[in-house]
Amino acid sequence: SSAASDVYKRQLVCEVIDELDISGKTIAVEPVGCAVTAHNYFDFDVVQAAHGRAPAVATGIKRSLPDRVVFTYQGDGDLASIGTAETVHSAARGENITVIFINNTIYGMTGGQMAPTSLPGQVTQTSPYGRDPKIQGNPVRVCEMLATLDGPSYIARVSTDSVPHIKDAKRAIKKAFENQINGKGFSIVEVLSTCPTNWGMSPVEAMQRVRDEMIPYYPLGVFKDIEDVEEDK
C-alpha cells in the first residue's frame, strides 16, 4: 500500500533524528493524507495540520519556539496541490524549517486520483485515459520551481529505489535537519516514492516504475545549496 511504502522514508527521518540526538526537541507536523498516521511511528511531539497547511503551522511553531527542530512530512497531494501557497511562501520567506516531501505522483489516501505531480499519460481514477497535458496541464516540478527563489537554503530530490540512492537520501535528509539546527533557513527534500495499490502494480513493478518513468521526469540531485554559493565567494 501507499502507507506501507512510506514506512522506509519515515525510518530514514527517525535515524537522522537519533543520530543528531535531537528527538527531545523535535516537533513534526503531519499532513492530511497517507502520512496522517505518522504520529504512530514517531517518538516525539507531532502536530496535525489542516490539508496543505503544514508549512504554515510549522512556521508558527518555529517562530514561537525557535529552540525546537520543526519539520513537516507531506505527500504530493498535500504539498503540491492544496498546499502550494504555504509551500512557496514559507520557502520564499526562508523560514527555518525542514520539509520532507514524499512524491508518489498520485492521491493515495483518497483512492488514486490524479495529482499535480502525476506524469503525462499516467492513468488514475480522474484521468482514466491517461493524463493529457493539453487538458490537465503538465506535472509540477516542485524542487525546480522553489530553486528560483532566494529564500531556500537547501533543495534536493532523492529516491529510495536502490541502496546507493537510499544512502544519498539519508545524507540529504540529514543535511536538511543540520541546516535548520545551524539557522540556515528553509530546506526541502523531495523523496520519489511508490504507491503500488493505486498504481495497480506489485511492489517490484512499482519500484521499477520509479526508475523507468519517475526519475527521468523528476531528475535526482541538489537544486540549491547555499553552502555551494558561499564556497564560490
Name the predicted role of every residue range.
Residues S1-Y8:
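Short, small-residue-biased leader/transition segments that mark boundaries at the very start
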Residues S2, I181-K233:
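Flexible, low-complexity linker and terminal segments
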Residues K9, D21-A38:
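N-terminal glycine-rich anion-binding loops that anchor highly charged ligand groups
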Residues E30-G108, R171-K175:
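Thiamine diphosphate
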Residues V32-C34, N104-I106, S162, E190-N198:
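Glycine-rich beta-alpha junction loops
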Residues D45-V47, S90, A115-L119, E205-Q208:
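Short, hinge-like loop/turn segments at secondary-structure boundaries
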Residues D67, A115-N182:
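Conserved thiamine diphosphate
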Residues T84-H89, M109-V123:
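Active-site-proximal loop->helix
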